[in-house]
Amino acid sequence: TDAVVEATAQTIPGYTYQPLFDENGMKTVASGTVAGDGSLVLNLYYTPDADALAYHANGGQGTMAATEGVTDQVVEVAANGFERAGYAFVGWNTAADGSGQAYAAGAGYALTAGDDALFAQWTANDGTAYTVNHYKVNAAHTAATLDNAENLNATTDASVSATPQTIPGYTYQPLFDENGM
């Protein structure tokens, strides 16, 4: 008893020790004299560090501002601000490949000490337009005239193959590569 003791601040990821904290009835008491009745209580206060939730386009285009907050604060997940041609945005995920925790816009996200990031998740659109042009090449192989253009649809990034058409008096040449044609 009657010994003076001093508490040692711990390292808590995402928090900073406040040796002079004195707010709302909370006050840091880092040292004191040990009373015989065991009534000494030392209180050390740590405040949360600034933190932010970053958003990644994950194949999309554009930029989005991070959602600002502090460690352990629940922040609202932002609506998507990215674009990706031929794709529809389907939500956010903590992993780029979609294997992590999924989040929707407006959902709560608890900031953690360290990096907090969400990755846009996309699904390929069905019905993405593409065109197949069928050309007739002149006898000298120096010019070509468009005979027919097919406007077709497929899933974005799907591998497609053109089907040759029958053009009377012409033979399809699958490996034709002359004079820039």
Positions of predicted regions on the chain:
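Secondary-structure capping and domain/repeat boundary segments
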Residues: 1-181
